């Protein structure tokens, strides 16, 4: 029972993590950050769709094989999860710094910036929960009953 519950938790948190990451990409393309350089995705562009496709591919391919019983892919997903943690944490620190130091003008699109911050916070929390779900050791009572 524990293994099935753990596997379901990993699946659900992986899907939530993918959703939050996609939200960050889409909301970022709607924000003033989309005008910050020549290589930034703008909303509806081919680059945005390719980015979303790549993110979903990198999330869903290892997850599909994990669901088929290849549990060693949990470590590959952990590497991607770590990258997601790094991106979420750095974005949560970078956006307020840009605002405080006056390097970016967020006045017209505050809603998209707040959406990015909420999505980053959701990604951060979801990825931490993912690590707990994926690598939690069974409790002593469960071990005794087995």
PLM ranges: what are they?
Residues 1-29, 132-146:
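Cytosolic juxtamembrane helix and N-cap/initiation of the first transmembrane helix
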């Amino acid at each position: 029972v524990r293994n099935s519950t753990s596997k379901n938790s990993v699946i659900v948190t992986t899907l939530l993590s993918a959703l939050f990451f996609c939200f960050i990409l889409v909301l970022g393309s709607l924000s003033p950050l989309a005008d910050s350089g020549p290589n930034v995705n703008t909303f509806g562009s081919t680059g945005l769709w390719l980015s979303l496709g790549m993110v979903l591919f990198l999330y869903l391919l290892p997850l599909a094989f994990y669901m088929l019983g290849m549990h060693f892919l949990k470590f590959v997903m952990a590497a991607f999860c770590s990258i997601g943690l790094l991106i979420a944490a750095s974005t949560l620190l970078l956006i307020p710094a840009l605002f405080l130091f006056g390097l970016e003008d967020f006045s017209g699109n505050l809603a998209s910036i707040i959406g990015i911050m909420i999505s980053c916070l959701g990604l951060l929390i979801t990825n931490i929960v993912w690590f707990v779900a994926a690598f939690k050791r069974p409790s002593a009572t469960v071990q005794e009953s087995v």
